[in-house]
Curated annotation (Swiss-Prot):
<dbReference type="InterPro" id="IPR000014">
    <property type="entry name" value="PAS"/>
</dbReference>
<keyword id="KW-0539">Nucleus</keyword>
<dbReference type="InterPro" id="IPR050933">
    <property type="entry name" value="Circadian_TF"/>
</dbReference>
<dbReference type="GO" id="GO:0034753">
    <property type="term" value="C:nuclear aryl hydrocarbon receptor complex"/>
</dbReference>
<dbReference type="GO" id="GO:0045944">
    <property type="term" value="P:positive regulation of transcription by RNA polymerase II"/>
</dbReference>
<dbReference type="InterPro" id="IPR036638">
    <property type="entry name" value="HLH_DNA-bd_sf"/>
</dbReference>
<dbReference type="GO" id="GO:1990837">
    <property type="term" value="F:sequence-specific double-stranded DNA binding"/>
</dbReference>
<dbReference type="GO" id="GO:0003700">
    <property type="term" value="F:DNA-binding transcription factor activity"/>
</dbReference>
<feature type="region of interest" description="Disordered">
    <location>
        <begin position="670"/>
        <end position="694"/>
    </location>
</feature>
<dbReference type="InterPro" id="IPR011598">
    <property type="entry name" value="bHLH_dom"/>
</dbReference>
<comment type="subunit">
    <text>Efficient DNA-binding requires dimerization with another bHLH protein. Heterodimer with the aryl hydrocarbon receptor (AHR).</text>
</comment>
<keyword id="KW-0677">Repeat</keyword>
<dbReference type="InterPro" id="IPR001610">
    <property type="entry name" value="PAC"/>
</dbReference>
<keyword id="KW-0010">Activator</keyword>
<feature type="domain" description="PAS 2">
    <location>
        <begin position="325"/>
        <end position="395"/>
    </location>
</feature>
<dbReference type="GO" id="GO:0005667">
    <property type="term" value="C:transcription regulator complex"/>
</dbReference>
<keyword id="KW-0804">Transcription</keyword>
Length: 723
């Protein structure tokens, strides 16, 4: 026992240090195990909690899912709002111009400011109606009345008295404003329509409340039973009645053609009886409004005039235009007098307006593909062909010509055609020619019936009647195709009687034919060698100058004592026989078109043959190689360009008083420096560089030397024209 007892302490003593270490390590291990066991305990605890929740029926899980769904919905809503505000920020210029992205409130504030600026300040009325800021109330009223083609009136609902009426009442009903203002609307209506007006002016409830007449379908529609609300915002009214037509005169010039025809084309109820007023059908549309309007204070006199009315009818009255005019004179006025056609450069119809049926009698399909020259008079075909060639060269400018057109009834109608070309804006090539063809006779009749107010004076009254058509101006030009033909001169061969004047005024004697009728040997072969071309005869309504520059200079020469030259085409001497005045008198000048170009035919290289023998009806030799253009009964000697040059009066060696080329334009010295280079390139066969001075006093006033050159005054004003 003793041996065993000490052995135990000895072992324990021998293992003292190691045992201490072991015990300490055991303690550490126990602490570590406790730390590690804690998570296990927690996990178990969590698991036990979950299990306990499951055991409780899953109420907490539903709450958690509900919270998650609500958060997702809110997140989506915030994302959408952010996207819309970002898009709004991009649309507002003030927001997009900022350096940094503004917050949401700033974006909304700037958007509201931008919308107000677009809408305009102060344009919104109390009832929410909108009016553009750039229009005044008066301008807006006129625009509305013009668009509605009617008149505006305001009527008191209780008394039926007219409180206001616009000035457009006069062209619609031929009554003045004073006839309506202050009067009863019942007096202006047909007696049988009084009950209808009383029903429309009534503001009380009725069985027909909310019923509207639809004019398009002819049915009665019901708008609903919101009478109290509609009365506050304005109850709509629409009805048809018969109104009395007055006798106040209407000035046609103050109205356009459409309004004038519509006022003439009233839907009358048959011819009025003697002593009875005439009534027309008027469609009235408007609203019942409170009177006086909110915020408007009336004077005592105005308050007495409305007789205590609380409501008024604000309406627009428009004429019911019938499809069958009742007026007999409308049958002639409504007939079309013109139609539009489209042609190619050769004159073929590519499009025809439907009004051609009433104007010339043809259906559009009958004219398509045909050449307009085929329907023109044989004597006018060359004139029309030249007009098409000229309008092509004018490139967009309007050219007017009058010719005879073969109608469907095989009658010749005088047609005035105003044509211009349409160019491709990219290639600048001519696509087609657009013509407006007007029947002159129908146009004059319609202008007479309209009292001169139709067409806004497009065709002036200065044009002559059909049997007295004046001779159109035709010129003679040389081989120089770089200059435009003169439209103010006439070729002598165009007159059937060579004793007539070379230049005729615009009011020539009636019955003068434009082309020779008999003994016309002007063949195609001769035409091919003829270097003289005829320009397009313009319409008589072209603007005409009062005096030409040639007349002014001729008058100055007579005052200075310059002797007239008998060989000059501008002066009449003993060798020329004029039909009207005595020998030695000056012929009248043609004041029609392009007067500044009248001096072009005066140059010696373009000289016409001189007139020899007052009654011999013979012409001198032409100083060119052109084929002669015969006239009726005229004898022509053989052409010798140089042998008979002395008979022309323009020979530079034998003539003392001569007209230089472009003497008429000598009053424009500032242009001569610009034209020298161009005119030196124009080589004429008989150019005379040194000619005597004609108007020394004129040149002295213009500070010009006495010796000048023809080429100084060659001014190509108009584009070139080649036959």
């Amino acid at each position: 026992m003793d041996s065993s007892i000490p052995d135990i302490p000895d072992d324990s003593l021998g293992l003292g240090a190691g045992g201490a270490q072991a015990s300490s390590s055991a303690c550490c291990a126990k602490r570590v195990n406790k730390r590690r066991a804690a998570p296990d305990f927690d996990d178990d605890d969590d698991g036990s909690k979950l299990f306990r929740c499951d055991d409780d029926g899953g109420g907490g899980d539903k709450e958690r899912f509900a919270r998650e769904n609500h958060s997702e919905i809110e997140r989506r809503r915030r994302n959408k709002m952010t996207a819309y505000i970002t898009e709004l920020s991009d649309m507002v210029p003030t927001c997009s111009a900022l350096a940094r992205k503004p917050d949401k409130l700033t974006i909304l504030r700037m958007a509201v400011s931008h919308m107000k600026s677009l809408r305009g300040s102060g344009n919104t009325a109390a009832d929410g109606t909108y009016k553009p800021s750039f229009l005044t109330d008066q301008e807006l009223k006129h625009l509305i009345l013009e668009a509605a083609d009617g008149f505006l009136f305001v009527v008191s609902c209780e008394s039926g008295r007219v409180v206001y009426v616009s000035d457009s009442l006069t062209p619609v009903l031929n009554q003045s404003q004073s006839d309506w203002l202050g009067s009863s609307l019942y007096d202006q209506l047909h007696p049988d329509d009084g009950d209808k007006l009383r029903e429309q002016l009534s503001t009380a409830e009725s069985n027909n409340t909310g019923r509207m007449l639809d004019l398009k379908t002819g049915t009665v529609k019901k708008e609903g039973q919101q009478s109290s609300v509609r009365m506050c915002m304005g109850a709509r009214r629409s009805f048809i009645c018969r109104m009395r037509c007055g006798s106040c005169p209407v000035e046609p010039m103050s109205m356009n053609r459409l309004n004038f025809l519509r006022s003439r084309n009233r839907n009358g109820l048959g011819p009025p009886k003697d002593g009875e007023p005439q009534y027309v059908v008027v469609h009235c549309t408007g609203y019942i409004k409170s009177w006086p309007p909110t915020g408007v204070n009336l004077t005592d006199e105005e308050a007495d005039n409305i007789l205590g009315s609380r409501y008024c009818l604000v309406a627009i009255g428009r004429l019911q235009v019938t499809s069958c005019p009742s007026d007999t004179d409308m049958n002639s006025i409504s007939v079309p007098v013109e139609f539009i056609s489209r042609h190619n450069c050769q004159g073929l119809f590519t499009f025809v307006d439907h009004r051609c049926m009433a104007t010339v009698g043809y259906q559009p399909q009958e004219l398509l593909g045909k050449n307009i020259l085929e329907l023109a008079h044989p004597e006018d075909q060359e004139l029309l062909r030249d007009s098409f060639q000229q309008v092509v060269k004018l490139k967009g400018q309007v050219l007017s010509v009058m010719f005879r057109f073969l109608s469907k009834t095989r009658d010749w109608l005088w047609i005035r055609t105003s044509s211009f070309t349409f160019q491709n804006p990219f290639s600048e090539e001519i696509e087609y020619i657009i013509c407006t063809n007007a029947n002159v006779k129908q146009l004059q009749q319609q202008q007479a019936e309209l009292g001169g107010g139709g067409r806004d004076g497009l065709y002036e009254a200065g044009q002559v009647t059909l049997p007295q058509m004046p001779v159109q101006a035709v010129t003679a030009a040389g081989t120089d195709h770089s200059k435009t033909m003169d439209k103010a001169e006439m070729h002598p061969s165009m007159y059937p009687n060579p004793d007539q004047a070379k230049f005729l005024p615009s009011t020539s004697a009636p019955g003068v034919p434009i082309y020779p009728q008999d003994n016309n040997n002007y063949t195609t072969a001769n035409r091919s060698n003829d270097t003289y071309s005829r320009s397009v005869g313009m319409a008589p309504q072209m603007v005409q100058p009062s005096h030409s520059a040639g007349q002014v200079l001729a008058q100055m020469s007579r005052q200075n004592g310059a002797p007239p030259s008998n060989s000059s085409p501008l002066q009449g001497g003993a060798a020329v026989s004029w039909p009207g005045p005595a020998a030695g008198a000056r012929p009248p000048f043609n004041n029609q078109q392009v007067v500044p170009q009248a001096g072009k035919a005066l140059s010696p290289q373009f000289a016409m043959g001189s007139f020899v023998g007052g009654s011999s009806s013979s012409f001198g030799a032409m100083p060119t190689t052109a084929a002669p253009t015969p006239t009726m009964g005229a004898n022509y000697p053989n052409i010798n360009p140089r042998a008979t040059l002395n008979t022309n009066g323009y020979d530079g060696l034998g003539s003392g008083q001569q007209f230089p080329s472009r003497a008429v334009e000598a009053v424009w010295p500032q242009w001569q420096g610009q034209q020298q280079a161009q005119n030196r390139a124009e080589q004429h066969p008989h150019t005379q560089n040194n000619q005597p001075d004609i108007f020394p006093d004129v040149l002295a006033m213009l500070d010009q030397p006495a010796n000048f050159n023809n080429d100084d005054f060659e001014i190509p004003i108009y584009p070139s024209f080649n036959e």
